[in-house]
Amino acid sequence: MASSTPSSSATSSNAGADPNTTNLRPTTYDTWCGVAHGCTRKLGLKICGFLQRTNSLEEKSRLVSAFKERQSSKNLLSCENSDRDARFRRTETDFSNLFARDLLPAKNGEEQTVQFLLEVVDILLNYVRKTFDRSTKVLDFHHPHQLLEGMEGFNLELSDHPESLEQILVDCRDTLKYGVRTGHPRFFNQLSTGLDIIGLAGEWLTSTANTNMFTYEIAPVFVLMEQITLKKMREIVGWSSKDGDGIFSPGGAISNMYSIMAARYKYFPEVKTKGMAAVPKLVLFTSEQSHYSIKKAGAALGFGTDNVILIKCNERGKIIPADFEAKILEAKQKGYVPFYVNATAGTTVYGAFDPIQEIADICEKYNLWLHVDAAWGGGLLMSRKHRHKLNGIERANSVTWNPHKMMGVLLQCSAILVKEKGILQGCNQMCAGYLFQPDKQYDVSYDTGDKAIQCGRHVDIFKFWLMWKAKGTVGFENQINKCLELAEYLYAKIKNREEFEMVFNGEPEHTNVCFWYIPQSLRGVPDSPQRREKLHKVAPKIKALMMESGTTMVGYQPQGDKANFFRMVISNPAATQSDIDFLIEEIERLGQDL
């Protein structure tokens, strides 16, 4: 992991200065005049007047003359600021008589396009503002039939004839209105939460560029950003900076699928051309509490879900290494060929971290590919305080890491990292002649598209790269540490209260805090099938009331023979202790009469 020590190159004279203001402080009258020129005439003259109080008569005269000359200029194109202000000034526009055909690239469509997009930006900014306003609901819940039947002014049905831009703007507002504010500080329902403003800016730019990630020739900057970022992520995992490979995929499930494909190709490259009939009876392993995507990949890739063997876990949801080794031996005795195991760093429900070191020892003993699904827990690698929970990850052959989860990058942003260079290319390359010509004028090794199972690939890198530039590694570290501190705060608040019961003993490893709310009617009642049956209904009822009121959202689920319990997860940097307190109080309020 890169050192977070601040650079010592700053001069001693600036040691106590705020770098954010020092670098922005204009040092010449021409610069100040430019600042004044970007303001209204009244404010600009005030800036000039302020400077005149401390400067010579000659300098005063030159500054004011320059300002007045620029203000009186009739040529708007003489200054970028003036040009911008003139072109992007809001005007009264009747959108009821305008249609998509009136926007660019229509002839004379620039003004209509500007006004339409300014309205859209207003809608977005209003949504962003409300997202961070705790007095605003997390959601305005409606049942599916209500939305399908249509709300006032909002109809999901598609029409044969174009609708006005006025209606399109209404549709934009209502789409956000009836959705869920996943960036709200009191949204705790999923592993992916938050609304990072830098990431939002990056996503706007990405959509505007509207390009594809398969070749350098159409996405030169984005392709290089992806390579640089993946290299940095591999280094943080603990691999050599010279080796390795990776690619961004549509999500953790696809990244996990890539890992199985890469492992199969590594051991049995003939499968690419001859199919599964040409290889032995293969089996792979994963924990009984791992993400369901491993079994889904087993079905999709032709192994069959019966050949995805589940390893037992302890009470905290971690793989039991002895059971893993026993199941390898059992499979071999039955004539199967074990080749792959998935260890999880941050399980979906308990937030458990499998013992990677012990699993890696077994993999080396039996020559298995070790994959670590760190989709949820990978962000902890950025934290010097918590990365020890992933000790041994550097021994993995591949790693899934989802920045759109713990790191707060906007959806979607998932990486598959592979220790050995060339396997992804060999596994997936099809050499489509219309895309991947070998005789281009640049180094075609930068045409990364043939490593992917997709052809078209969305640009997921820019928002992540931009956030990393804005926060730095230290910024991500602080963000992740804060979320884990909030989980510890929640655990400490409820662990000894009679109205709450923890699903397992001990502090959480991740931000997952699993608990039951015990209504008054069940407190002090001994454990029995009847009590568990009643308790099983509590979390769904509270969740339904929670969604109806729209005040907060938190997930629930059963696990094994356990009754439904709440699974609290914290990945939103906007959340605070007061939001945790609110959640506890809201659960008590909604569940007190059950």
Swiss-Prot record:
InterPro entries: PyrdxlP-dep_de-COase, PyrdxlP-dep_Trfase, PyrdxlP-dep_Trfase_major, Pyridoxal-P_BS. It comes from the Eukaryota. Gene3D superfamilies: 3.90.1150.170, Type I PLP-dependent aspartate aminotransferase-like (Major domain) (3.40.640.10). GO terms for cellular component: axon terminus; cell cortex; clathrin-sculpted gamma-aminobutyric acid transport vesicle membrane; cytoplasm; GABA-ergic synapse; inhibitory synapse; perinuclear region of cytoplasm; plasma membrane. Residues 1-23 are annotated as: Disordered. The keyword Acyltransferase does not apply. Its EC number is 4.1.1.15. This is Glutamate decarboxylase 1. It comes from Homo sapiens.
